[in-house]
């Protein structure tokens, strides 16, 4: 088995999908999890206005609405959380995503004060954060807020990770990567677009340039610029296509280097890090 085949298998990626079937699969997956643990009453997700959170949010709301109708349990709810750092540049996209998702409840938690307080506490301890590390601080603060909300609403935190993101480890460890349940796992980026199109999502929400937008010094830095490869490259790789060797090497380099992000804390029984 080649490394490409190993990666495709590990991430559950497929070269072709039926969007309607994958929508149903994700919704049923979320419903089944909640039914297994009836003490859970909410799905919680941060909405950024980008493709991934818009899709995960819509699927979550669909799952909650169906389960509420089927069980008569009106305590079930989907909570969409806006988590700006100060004022978000693409706030209108966030509002458009909320309008498309139609969540049961919307909360807004501005994380700027918490991030600055944490940064100041570290500064007083003699640690000055770099812009990159401050970006990770933002991602972790967002996740902390979501878990606090989930804790107070008997909920679970929904993640937006998918195969095209997982392969490169393009997420913050214990930040946006630290979630309870990931309904998009297995899909690549273009397949996520197919699901949103099938759901009737406004095109600008899934055709916009993907960006984590975590760094102050490089605002709205495109994911593809940070990675050195395009999502089309990554999707082609995950679909089993043959790529330029240099591009394939870059993708595989990211996969190997970020394996620790896809694992629980390393123990003496792990050896993946030795390769």
From Swiss-Prot:
GO terms for biological process: NAD biosynthetic process. Mg(2+) binds at residues 52, 165. Keywords: ATP-binding, Ligase, Magnesium, Metal-binding, NAD, Nucleotide-binding. The keyword Metal-binding applies. Deamido-NAD(+) binds at residues 140, 173, 180, 260-261. ATP binds at residues 46-53, 160, 189, 211. It is an enzyme of class 6 (ligase). GO terms for molecular function: ATP binding; glutaminase activity; metal ion binding; NAD+ synthase (glutamine-hydrolyzing) activity; NAD+ synthase activity. One of its GO terms (cellular component) is cytoplasm. Pathway: Cofactor biosynthesis; NAD(+) biosynthesis; NAD(+) from deamido-NAD(+) (ammonia route): step 1/1. The keyword ATP-binding applies. Pfam families: NAD_synthase (PF02540). Catalyzes the ATP-dependent amidation of deamido-NAD to form NAD. Uses ammonia as a nitrogen source. Belongs to the NAD synthetase family. This is NH(3)-dependent NAD(+) synthetase.
């Amino acid at each position: 088995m080649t490394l490409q085949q190993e990666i495709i298998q590990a991430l559950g990626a497929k070269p072709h999908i039926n969007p309607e079937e994958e929508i149903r699969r994700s919704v049923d997956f979320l419903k089944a999890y909640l039914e297994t643990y009836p003490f859970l009453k909410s799905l919680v997700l941060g909405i950024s206005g980008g493709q991934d959170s818009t899709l995960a949010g819509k699927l979550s709301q669909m799952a909650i609405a169906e389960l509420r109708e089927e069980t008569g349990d009106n305590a079930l709810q989907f909570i969409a959380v806006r988590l700006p750092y100060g004022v978000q540049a693409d706030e209108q996209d966030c509002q458009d995503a909320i309008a498309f998702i139609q969540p049961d409840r919307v909360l807004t938690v501005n994380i700027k004060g918490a991030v600055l307080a944490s940064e100041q506490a570290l500064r007083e301890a003699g640690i000055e954060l770099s812009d990159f590390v401050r970006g990770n601080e933002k991602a972790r603060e967002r996740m902390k807020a979501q878990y606090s909300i989930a804790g107070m609403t008997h909920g679970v935190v929904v993640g937006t990770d998918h195969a095209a993101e997982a392969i490169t480890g393009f997420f913050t460890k214990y930040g946006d990567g630290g979630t309870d349940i990931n309904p998009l796992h297995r899909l690549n980026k273009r397949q996520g677009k197919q699901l949103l199109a099938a759901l009737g999502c406004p095109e600008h929400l899934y055709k916009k340039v993907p960006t984590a937008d975590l760094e102050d010094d490089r605002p709205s830095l495109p994911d593809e610029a940070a990675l050195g490869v395009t999502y089309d490259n990554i999707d082609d790789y995950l679909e089993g296509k043959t790529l330029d060797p240099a591009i394939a090497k870059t993708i595989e380099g990211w996969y190997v280097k970020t394996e620790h992000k896809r694992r629980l804390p390393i123990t003496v029984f792990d050896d993946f890090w030795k390769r």
